[in-house]
């Protein structure tokens, strides 16, 4: 399935499904479905221990997905109201007409995502990528950054074979020797490193002009109908993020937190602790600034979304770029959390 076909499939029922949810599904918020992924995040402990439910007063149905593209497909169908996604599928989905709002910035480009090349592939430096077979999850930030990296090197998909396949398939193909490398996040990142090395990180590619982020988004209808839910949800994320930053020892490989993450997400507690150390996190006060969620048209996130969309159009992955992406970003929840914390 091509990138464009996948996006069209994701969004084919988006307008009708979101409108239906807004009309009949969000009145009481007695049930909320939240999509998450396998990334190691401090707040995922709150999925495991039920603190999100307690804080919001809602029995949340948490569902795990393999990628942001899958989450946007579920949002478009009306099955999911809140989700954790990356900036590339976010830009693609909104460019196609899906109306969602980023209300919490989970992380920005760091070393938690990277291009790993296989031992024996003949790749020692970026100059060795020509003629190789690489992969990334479809419609993901990794896919976007892999293409952006190749462009910065003067290479195209004619020079390097790029496969857009799910992460489990990347790991399997890499281990068989069918792939020379993959741009991935955990747990695939740790799996690939067992027989390879990191060639370049997400942070490295961001510094070359292709920044990315991961964020929590909600459908526009849900965000308007349930601001208190989003505030409480964001408050839990901020609480666990602050705990991790203030006392990293409580999040080490032998900690209960790391064990909880491993139980929820897979891998070992040591894997999860290592993943946490690689995150690039921002406090809510910084998130609320114009550099990120605040500022309307000046919003840093809105600018990244547009820059990403422009690149995706150049690569013929989407057909349209919107004049502005400011409508898909809101600082309301993080501002409320900041005021509530007194910070």
Report each predicted region and the residues it spans:
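Secondary-structure end/capping motifs
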Residues: 224-317
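Bacterial N-terminal signal peptides
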Residues: 10-22
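Short, glycine-/small- and polar/acidic-enriched structural segments
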Residues: 29-156, 161-169, 173, 180-186, ...
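Sec/Tat signal peptide C-region and signal peptidase I cleavage site
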Residues: 22-28
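Conserved C-terminal helix/tail region of periplasmic/extracytoplasmic solute-binding proteins
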Residues: 301-343
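Pocket-lining segment of extracytoplasmic ligand-binding domains
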Residues: 88, 169-266
């Amino acid at each position: 399935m091509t990138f464009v076909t996948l996006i069209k499939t994701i969004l084919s029922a988006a307008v009708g499904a979101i409108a239906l949810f807004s009309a009949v599904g969000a009145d009481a918020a007695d049930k909320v479905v939240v999509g998450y992924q396998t990334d190691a995040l401090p707040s995922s402990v709150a999925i495991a221990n039920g603190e999100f439910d307690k804080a919001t007063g809602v029995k949340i149905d948490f569902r795990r997905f393999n990628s942001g593209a899958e989450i946007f497909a579920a949002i478009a169908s009306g099955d999911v109201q809140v989700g954790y996604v990356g900036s590339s599928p976010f830009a693609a989905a909104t460019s196609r007409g899906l109306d969602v709002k980023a209300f919490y910035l989970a992380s920005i480009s760091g070393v938690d995502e990277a291009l790993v090349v296989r031992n024996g592939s003949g790749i020692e430096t970026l100059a060795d990528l020509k003629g190789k077979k690489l992969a990334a999850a479809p419609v993901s930030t990794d896919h976007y950054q892999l293409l952006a990296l190749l462009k910065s090197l003067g290479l195209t998909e004619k020079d390097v074979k790029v496969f857009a396949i799910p992460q489990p398939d990347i790991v399997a193909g890499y281990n068989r020797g069918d792939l020379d490398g993959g741009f991935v996040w955990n747990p695939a990142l740790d799996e690939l490193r067992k027989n390879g090395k990191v060639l370049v990180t997400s942070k490295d590619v961001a510094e070359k002009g292709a920044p990315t982020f991961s964020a929590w988004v909600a459908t526009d209808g849900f965000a308007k109908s349930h601001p208190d839910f989003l505030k409480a949800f964001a408050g839990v994320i901020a609480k666990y993020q602050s705990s991790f930053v203030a006392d990293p020892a409580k999040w080490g490989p032998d900690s209960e937190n790391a064990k909880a993450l491993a139980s929820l997400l897979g891998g070992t507690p040591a894997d999860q602790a290592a993943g946490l150390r690689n995150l690039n996190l921002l406090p809510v006060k910084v998130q609320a600034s114009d550099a990120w969620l605040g500022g309307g048209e000046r919003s840093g996130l809105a600018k990244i979304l547009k820059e990403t969309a422009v690149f995706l159009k150049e690569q013929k992955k989407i057909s349209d770029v919107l004049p502005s992406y400011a409508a898909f970003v809101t600082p309301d929840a993080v501002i409320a959390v900041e005021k509530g914390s007194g910070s």
